[in-house]
Amino acid sequence: MGERKGIPMALGLLAMILFFIASSSSHLVRASDDADDAIFYESFDEDFDGRWIVSDKEDYNGVWKHAKSDGHDDYGLLVSEQARKYAIVKELAESVSLKDGTVVLQFETRLQNGLECGGAYIKYLRPQESGWKPKEFDNESPYSIMFGPDKCGATNKVHFIFKHKNPKSGEYVEHHLKYPPSVPSDKLTHVYTAILKPDNELQILIDGEEKKKANFLSSEDFEPPLIPSKTIPDPDDKKPEDWDERAKIPDPSAVKPDDWDEDAPMEILDEEAEKPEGWLDDEPEEIDDPEATKPEDWDDEEDGEWEAPKIENPKCEAAPGCGEWKRPTKRNPAYKGKWSAPYIDNPSYKGIWKPREIPNPEYFELAKPDFEPIAAIGIEIWTMQDGILFDNVLIANDDKVAESYRETTWKPKFTVEKDKLKAEEEAATGSDGISGFQKKVFDLLYKIADIPFLSEHKSKIFDLIEKAEKQPNLTIGILVAVVVVFVSIFFRLIFGGKKPAKVEKKPERTEASNNQGSGENEENKEKEKQKEEASNAARRRPRRET
């Protein structure tokens, strides 16, 4: 009987176990379904060793680590050392075509120690013509797309660069997104998304929010444009020798007036000036300091005869002046300077010469970009900061899949980090919330600085904002300076200004040099200037020559 009574309890326990397994299985199925929807996904939950290949090239001596994000149990790929070059690559099982349908590129980065000078972008590599050798991955390895944050000096942008093969010349050309969004200035986890759509549209999202929209075929969105100009200046055309570009010329009939004195000086003595009353002619402007004494360690033989330092003569303070009075000079009313003939319109003026336009031999038309496929994913960067963490690298063919990953992998971490930061700010500044207010102001200013027509002033605005972030006690003054910059730009736009001369651009014929982002380009510019050591010895006057 006892055994029979235990049967219902056992069945109940079994039911609970089955329910737990079913619940767990449902989660696993959903995760599995998400993974199945992704073309490629790397969570870095497991060690990358053996799956991602670190470059053997000598320049890339930065150490990658499998590490937890600060404050989380979530693992990522960590840049562990400062001032190093890093290169690591993951070959895909199958190449990913970018020609048909939507393709979404997404990954997370966390700049745990900030980013002063360096890159945190990813390169989506095209198939290697000479065969794939992951251990030889470097900045020369050809890529199809480069996407992600880069910051150094005046550069502060989320790159989107694609390389496209000119079907006429056979050369690859880099096309850079114009006016890209700025890199978030905090140390939180951020997710970067690039959505390539079949209608030639590109969307750049940061933390799921659209920051930039562009069209691959638009000359307004990429530099240089994907579609070259139909004509180009004829490189063989030469300016005729008799071509006169002078709009104005000296009047050949003009004659110097007879009363024009070219030798008259610009200034003459003011004969009407008089010496002020009370001028002390016999008092020097400087006297020996009566309180000065010769240092005890002064050696006359080694250091020369000691002389007291000079101070201003106190008697001269109440007087209009001391020493010899000299008559001042004034501008010579008869001065005219060198004579030159006035300018008149040039009757032979033909305008500014330009070479004639000829058909561009490299011109082509496309209905859509002919992207190279993605065969591997690589991170090749140079950075002055450590603590950069890469995580949740995703390639998908549906932006809904990317959104799902953001919600499940990025958002929980970001929420925790944001709440922690808010609590720290409130603890540091009290309950008045000043720091939180400053953060909102900074975020707004960064967004304003991203407006395209402010691009030429962007670096100046960023410098002021970053100075305010680093010196909170000066924030108000610096914010005023930023406002002054905005106001000056506003007035310049309202009232106009001198427009720069229009310069015609020649289309690029050859592949642009492998642009690795300004981080690497700025490497040689970031060397510290050496300063001479200041002397600690007391100043000593040298022996006067007699």
From Swiss-Prot:
Gene Ontology terms describing biological process: ERAD pathway; protein folding
Residue segments, region P domain (Extended arm): 232-365
Stretches that traverse the bilayer: 476-496
Cell location: Endoplasmic reticulum membrane
GO MF term set: calcium ion binding; carbohydrate binding; unfolded protein binding
Alphabetical keyword list: Calcium, Chaperone, Disulfide bond, Endoplasmic reticulum, Glycoprotein, Lectin, Membrane, Metal-binding, Repeat, Signal, Transmembrane, Transmembrane helix
Main subcellular localisation: endoplasmic reticulum
GO cellular component terms, A-Z: endoplasmic reticulum membrane
Sequence repeat segments: 234-245, 251-262, 270-281, 289-300, 304-314, 323-333, 337-347, 351-361
SUPFAM superfamilies: Concanavalin A-like lectins/glucanases, P-domain of calnexin/calreticulin
InterPro entries given in the database record: Calret/calnex, Calret/calnex_CS, Calreticulin/calnexin_P_dom_sf, ConA-like_dom_sf
Keyword Lipoprotein (UniProt): no
Domain of life: Eukaryota
Signal peptide stretch: 1-25
Cytoplasmic-facing ranges: 497-546
Binding site residues for an alpha-D-glucoside: Y121, K123, Y143, D150, E380
Sugar-bearing residue positions: N473
S-S bonds: C117-C152, C316-C322
Residue stretches of biased makeup (Basic and acidic residues): 233-249, 501-511, 522-534
Similarity field: Belongs to the calreticulin family.
PANTHER family registered for this protein in UniProt: CALNEXIN HOMOLOG, CALRETICULIN AND CALNEXIN
Name by which UniProt lists this protein: Calnexin homolog
Origin species: Glycine max
